[in-house]
Amino acid sequence: MAKLTKRMRVIRDKVDATKQYDITEAIALLKELATAKFVESVDVAVNLGIDARKSDQNVRGATVLPHGTGRSVRVAVFTQGANAEAAKAAGAELVGMEDLAEQIKKGEMNFDVVIASPDAMRVVGQLGQISGPRGLMPNPKVGTVTPNVAEAVKNAKAGQVRYRNDKNGIIHTTIGKVDFDADKLKENLEALLVALKKAKPSQAKGMYIKKVSLSTTMGAGVAIDQSGLSAAAN
């Protein structure tokens, strides 16, 4: 059996795995236990009442968090003409068509998000085996294939998070950094839950948001009492 580190022992002693914490108490606990030598992210796991084996119950989308994620995001855009100028003006680091595709084929992928206008998908489609496994393939379901590339760039820069349930019906994403004010983390979490509720599949029955847990990059999960969140997020 692996030996517990001092940090792991502290977390084990502080976090009650059987308890649902009020959101304010949970955030204070996460901040107390975030002792890594870097600013840890605050991540959320949301257990959904869906059958992930059925394609019509899968949940996928994107939403802009009111206070962003605390990450600087580099954006690449496949488009041309006036859209290319608009993308650059909106802050995209890389804009192009075949030239950008050639960079990616060479392994030059210094970006976090890829956006494409519909007319560029003939070029982007060639990159599926490279971009797909890295989660960088543009998709209309999360707003990264769109005629309005400038708005998509602004959303990405403003702290948009993309979400997709895993095979167990759980959504994993980030809602900010541990040095965010508690109110900002709470509001970001509520915004995500509102977006997930709007994305509820009509075929999903029973309780939809079954469990919400927060953790930091290096910390343990803390279950959240949802009654302490805004009415819209419940």
From Swiss-Prot:
Belongs to which family? Belongs to the universal ribosomal protein uL1 family.
Q: Which GO terms describe its cellular component?
A: cytosolic large ribosomal subunit
* Function, as annotated: Binds directly to 23S rRNA. The L1 stalk is quite mobile in the ribosome, and is involved in E site tRNA release.
The protein in question is named: Large ribosomal subunit protein uL1
Keyword Protease on entry: no
Q: Which gene encodes it?
A: rplA
Supply the SUPFAM superfamilies for this chain.
Answer: Ribosomal protein L1
Species, as recorded: Serratia marcescens
Keywords in alphabetical order: Repressor, Ribonucleoprotein, Ribosomal protein, RNA-binding, rRNA-binding, Translation regulation, tRNA-binding
The UniProt entry, under Pfam families, shows:
Ribosomal_L1 (PF00687)
Q: Which InterPro entries match?
A: Ribosom_uL1_bac-type (IPR005878), Ribosomal_uL1 (IPR002143), Ribosomal_uL1-like (IPR023674), Ribosomal_uL1/biogenesis (IPR028364), Ribosomal_uL1_3-a/b-sand (IPR016095), Ribosomal_uL1_CS (IPR023673)
Q: Which domain of life is it from?
A: Bacteria
BP GO annotations = regulation of translation; translation
An annotated Gene Ontology molecular function: rRNA binding
Q: How does it assemble?
A: Part of the 50S ribosomal subunit.
